[in-house]
């Protein structure tokens, strides 16, 4: 499932004194099976961009092409329903949107609205919940008796159980403990690798971007200013600082060691394991 933005702009409250241009002439493509990060400062247009994928917002000008479906400002809601089954969006703090009295009812609410095969949905949901570390009787429990991290996993499961081709996550690990954060990020990566899902991650957490992402799309003041790999972006720490973004911890460590020993590695490490291998190789060469 390929999504192409063609000269997409979006204006909030158009024609009023409060008019605000949130997106300006976005031209980009999201390919099936890749893991993307959409990054930028607060107010750069990230959340507005992702709301166009399933028609929560429609372009003020320009168009989206999602496989054979074209979305413009004139597109009818009945057309959008076709793509909403295939694109799952997990918004910030999704646990705040839970309302059913059992995990099973919560997970099945969306699929029932789309007339999906319930047995298949339950089977997928059950496997996801077990992978997240829940007990086998989880489906009959109330989500409101669980911790914040557990509720977040339930909310994410309710989207993933619908088996979307594209999974969009807006700050999915915000406010979570390290264990829950790690579980969620590993699960999402597993979906990409094993099921060829397209993943679109909106985040300020650059450690996750470095570790999991294939391609970065950088937003600034409603414009897409660059598309690049994590290694290319984080190799230029001055540029990262200019964007007012954090440098991943492993990159900070590498730069500190390079400055201390005046030895410069031939590439930037994106994970701890990668840096350990580079460091060991350097130490062996020094002997």
UniProtKB/Swiss-Prot annotation:
SUPFAM superfamilies with a match to the protein in the record: P-loop containing nucleoside triphosphate hydrolases
Domain of life of the source: Bacteria
PANTHER family: ENERGY-COUPLING FACTOR TRANSPORTER ATP-BINDING PROTEIN ECFA2, HEAVY METAL TRANSPORTER
Function: ATP-binding (A) component of a common energy-coupling factor (ECF) ABC-transporter complex. Unlike classic ABC transporters this ECF transporter provides the energy necessary to transport a number of different substrates.
Keyword Nucleotidyltransferase tagged: no
GO molecular function, one term: ATP hydrolysis activity
Coiled-coil annotated residue ranges, if any: none
Keywords: ATP-binding, Cell membrane, Membrane, Nucleotide-binding, Translocase, Transport
Ranges of residues in domain ABC transporter: 3-246
Enzyme Commission number: 7.-.-.-
Compartment list: Cell membrane
Protein name per Swiss-Prot or TrEMBL: Energy-coupling factor transporter ATP-binding protein EcfA2
Assembly description: Forms a stable energy-coupling factor (ECF) transporter complex composed of 2 membrane-embedded substrate-binding proteins (S component), 2 ATP-binding proteins (A component) and 2 transmembrane proteins (T component).
Binding site for ATP: 40-47
Enzyme class: translocase
UniProt record similarity statement: Belongs to the ABC transporter superfamily. Energy-coupling factor EcfA family.
Pfam families linked to this entry: ABC_tran
Gene that this sequence comes from: ecfA2
Keyword Zinc-finger in record: no
GO cellular component: ATP-binding cassette (ABC) transporter complex
């Amino acid at each position: 499932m390929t999504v192409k933005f063609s000269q997409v702009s979006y204006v909030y409250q158009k024609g009023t004194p409060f008019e605000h241009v949130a997106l300006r002439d976005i031209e980009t493509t999201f390919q099936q099976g890749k893991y993307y990060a959409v990054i930028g400062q607060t107010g750069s247009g990230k959340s507005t961009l992702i709301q166009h994928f399933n028609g929560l917002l429609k372009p003020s000008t320009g168009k989206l092409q999602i496989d054979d479906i074209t979305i413009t400002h004139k597109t009818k809601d009945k057309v959008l329903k076709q793509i909403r089954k295939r694109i799952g969006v997990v918004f910030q703090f999704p646990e705040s949107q839970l309302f059913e009295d059992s995990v099973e009812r919560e997970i099945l609410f969306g699929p029932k609205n789309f007339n999906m095969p319930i047995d298949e949905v339950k089977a997928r949901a059950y496997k996801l919940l077990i992978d997240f570390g829940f007990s086998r009787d989880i489906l009959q429990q109330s989500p409101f008796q669980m911790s914040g991290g557990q509720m977040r996993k339930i909310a994410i499961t309710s989207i993933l159980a619908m088996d979307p081709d594209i999974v969009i996550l807006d700050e999915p690990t915000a406010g979570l403990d390290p264990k829950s954060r790690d579980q969620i990020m590993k699960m999402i990566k597993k979906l990409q690798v094993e099921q060829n899902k397209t993943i679109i991650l909106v985040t300020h957490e650059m450690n996750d971007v470095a570790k999991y992402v294939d391609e970065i799309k950088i937003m600034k003041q409603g414009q897409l200013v660059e598309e690049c790999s994590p290694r290319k972006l984080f190799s230029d720490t001055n540029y990262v600082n200019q964007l007012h973004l954090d440098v991943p911890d492993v990159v900070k460590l590498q730069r500190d060691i390079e400055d201390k020993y005046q030895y410069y590695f031939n590439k930037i490490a994106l994970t701890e394991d990668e840096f350990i291998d580079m460091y060991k190789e350097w130490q062996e060469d020094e002997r």
